[in-house]
Design a protein with these regions (language model features):
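Glycine-rich phosphate-binding loop and adjacent beta-alpha segment
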Residues: 217-289, 322-325
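Short amphipathic alpha-helix with an adjacent loop that forms part of the alpha/beta core around
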Residues: 194-204
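A glycine-/small-residue-rich N-terminal strand-loop-strand element
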Residues: 67-89
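N-terminal glycine-rich beta->alpha transition that marks the start or flank
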Residues: 11-13, 20-67
Length: 325
């Protein structure tokens, strides 16, 4: 089978190679999935560079999120062959992957593979962060990197609940689509004063919560635009720069900054919560109450082109790997 592998840590363009490997055999409790589509997310890039929350076991196959059909079952597993599944785990960028059967999520029949391969990480992170922020109708939440797939899911979920969203982008061309999606205000971080823009948009109320993917000076500006007792949830570091914290601001506004990692949040849920949240999110995606944008699909042999496109400026949708190409 073909797989995208790296044998050392570094930039994807320097360390990724498409290789031929034996088709894996499912162990006890596992299923083998014939992968149809896979997502490319920032966590994939951080993992390849050794900057993610888990370390690669070299040689390592890349990719964390995908969809496909059950191709074989290990001992103790009874799952019909051909069953569509949504799954996460390391080593997804391959034509076949073995995963624990209990972690596979059945794919709704009406859900396309384009949506299914991105149906877990970003939608559930958006749901989880809104849940942790405990926002109510009328509250304000601010998003950095508002044009990202994650932020678009937050905008949709929040607006459905009457929560007001402000976002930052790096070009005016990105504004209108996000406003059409449900955001109340979009700020060009390069040309506008963030504090003044937030004050105007919120009529001086400022924001109760912020979801930050960038870090650095931008996150510091967002903290300054928060109301007393506000909470910032940090889930990324696109700038690769730490947040320069203003101790006085934290003290006198009683601000809270905390990290958010989907794996930790999912593990914290009760069985009852999981049985409610997972179907709710998948139903919204299937009915397109949550819309997932796709910009382009590439074959596994085009992985370097796909990553270059994913990391390039001005992108408006997800970049996928299509294993049928």
């Amino acid at each position: 089978m073909k797989a995208v592998q790296f044998t050392s840590l570094g930039l994807p363009t320097e360390v990724l190679k498409v290789v031929e490997l034996p088709k894996p055999a499912p162990a006890e409790g596992e299923i083998r999935v014939k992968v149809t589509k896979a997502n490319i997310i920032p966590a994939d890039i951080m993992f390849i560079q050794g900057k993610y929350g888990i370390r690669p076991e070299l040689p390592q196959i890349g990719g964390f999120e995908g969809t496909g059909t059950v191709d074989a079952c290990g001992a103790g597993v009874e799952m019909p062959l051909g069953t569509g599944v949504i799954f996460t785990g390391s080593g997804v960028w391959a034509e076949y992957v073995c995963i624990p059967a209990k972690t596979a999520i059945p794919k709704p029949q009406a859900m396309s593979d384009d949506v299914a391969c991105q149906a877990f990480v970003n939608p559930f992170t958006a749901y989880g962060m809104l849940m942790e922020a405990d926002l109510q109708a009328g509250d304000w939440v601010m998003l950095t990197a508002a044009n990202s797939a994650f932020s678009k899911f937050v905008i949709q979920l929040a607006s459905q609940r009457g929560i007001n969203v402000i976002g930052t982008v790096r070009s005016d061309e990105q504004k209108q689509a996000l406003l059409d999606l449900g955001a109340k205000a979009i700020i060009n971080e390069k040309t506008e004063n963030i504090y003044k823009a937030v004050k105007t948009a919120t009529d001086g109320v400022m924001v109760k919560a912020a979801f930050d993917a960038v870090g650095g000076a931008l996150a510091d500006k967002v903290l300054n635009a928060m109301q007393a007792n506000g909470k910032m949830f940090v889930y990324g570091l696109l700038s690769l720069q730490p947040i320069p914290l203003n101790s006085g601001l934290l003290i006198f506004k009683n601000l809270t900054i905390k990290g958010f990692w989907l794996s930790t949040w999912m593990a914290s849920l009760t069985r009852e919560q999981r049985s409610t949240i997972i179907p709710e999110v998948l139903t919204k995606l299937t009915k397109q109450d949550l819309k997932a944008d796709i910009e382009a699909s590439y074959s596994i042999d085009e992985i370097l082109k796909a990553i270059a496109h994913m990391e390039g400026p001005g992108r408006s949708g997800k970049i996928l790997l299509d294993f049928s190409k």
